């Protein structure tokens, strides 16, 4: 992700409620699980996507803790 995309993603997250953030986190965790499964099977072409999803999950958790 480019810097502007990251800023837009975080801005979008800050506009969500706690429930929506939890839903977003679950979606990202499911995507991470699927990506890991593909990587283990040797089918994953864009391995950098694993790191992107992990960082997005961390961003969601950061915004959640900011809201508390």
Curated annotation (Swiss-Prot):
Keyword Membrane: no
InterPro entries, per the entry: Ribosomal_protein_uL29 (IPR050063), Ribosomal_uL29 (IPR001854), Ribosomal_uL29_CS (IPR018254), Ribosomal_uL29_sf (IPR036049)
Keywords: Ribonucleoprotein, Ribosomal protein
GO term, biological process aspect, one: translation
UniProt xrefs under Pfam families: Ribosomal_L29
GO molecular function: structural constituent of ribosome
The keyword Zinc is annotated on this UniProt entry: no
Native source species: Streptococcus pyogenes serotype M1
SUPFAM superfamilies referenced in this protein's UniProt entry, alphabetically: Ribosomal protein L29 (L29p)
Protein family per UniProt: Belongs to the universal ribosomal protein uL29 family.
Protein known as: Large ribosomal subunit protein uL29
GO cellular component, one term: cytosolic large ribosomal subunit
């Amino acid at each position: 992700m480019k810097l502007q995309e990251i800023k837009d993603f975080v801005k979008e997250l800050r506009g969500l409620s706690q429930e929506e953030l939890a839903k977003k986190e679950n979606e990202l965790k499911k995507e991470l699980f699927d990506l890991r499964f593909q990587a283990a099977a040797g089918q994953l072409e864009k391995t950098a996507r694993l790191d992107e999803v992990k960082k997005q999950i961390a961003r969601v958790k950061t915004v959640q803790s900011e809201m508390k």
